[in-house]
Amino acid sequence: MSVEDRFQALIDADVAAWPDMPGRLLHVLAPGLDVDIEVAAGVQEVGGGPLQPGSRFRIASVTKPFVATATLRLVEQGRVSLDQTVAELLAGPYDELLRSGGYETDAITLRHLLTHTSGIYDFAADAYGQELTDGFTAQVAKDPGHRWTRFEQIRWAVEYGKPYGPPGTVFGYSDTGACLVGEILERVTGQSLGAAIRELVDYERLGIRTTWQETIEDEPPDLPPLSHQYERDLDIAVMDASVDLYGGGGLMSTCGDLARFFRALLRDEIFERPETLATMTDTLDGLPRAMGTSDETVSNAAMYLFRAEVADVTWWGHDGYWGTTAYTCPTRDVTIVTSHQRSDMPEGFKRMALVADAFVALEGL
């Protein structure tokens, strides 16, 4: 059986095992093994034709590593410092809004924002299993076509939630913080978030051709088909992109582009200085998790990256709410990206299981 057939068998079995999953994409990039393969199983959309390899989709929070990378390029250029405060970087309405919610913006730094240690409440908290009455996700479901602004989402966090804790004392995953980083990128560069990331990461040099900020940047030419993603019975294609557009998410991409990005990032092919990647992958030292149990700590989180131990090797990457998982193993030069097309998979589904299985399928090459 060829390695492509092995990958195909894996996702065929996945789609068969999880009937709620409309389809699944899998891309494996391992240049040392002469592997650059994408396979698909299932359907393009519920009731539609077969899912096509290379399809595009909303990558949601997998946008965050792009945002962090672009921000660290600004640090290398001396245009911002990780120790600058929100009060300095976001003077004006955003600073005033955060202060009105009890946030000490002169104590919250860019570093805190990039490591989810700012203490700023996540406006999308109910999307991550913290069921809150009439939360942000519920509002989106009521009016999926609403055009959100970044300021609205920050205001939601301030008015709806309370600070997780003083900056630097707790890990609290925060789309709010990522949206603030997006605002900083736009202010410093004078560009849209998508254009700033494109230039600072240097998509052209990396061969990233089908990644863009949805509705803000022009769509690239020769657009691949859309892989429809779902929240329960709702096709999120009807959701205005602004629900997740300003830094916490916002990019549309493909598995292949994501594989090229994560491989280049963790092979240190984007930054100018070796210490930059070391800073980005410096993990937290057992900080307590906001809203977690009293003894729950986080030690695998870095700057918009997470470390995972899978199949006895170390991987770095990030997940996206709508079903994207993108991880790379720099010591083996293997990058694996999957998309399973929905946010609400049943209990027992493990995102990293396919990463492990695909990695094992490379054995013997």
Feature map (PLM): residue ranges:
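Short alpha-helical patches at coil-to-helix transitions and adjacent helical residues
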Residues: 62-68, 107-110, 173-178, 255-258
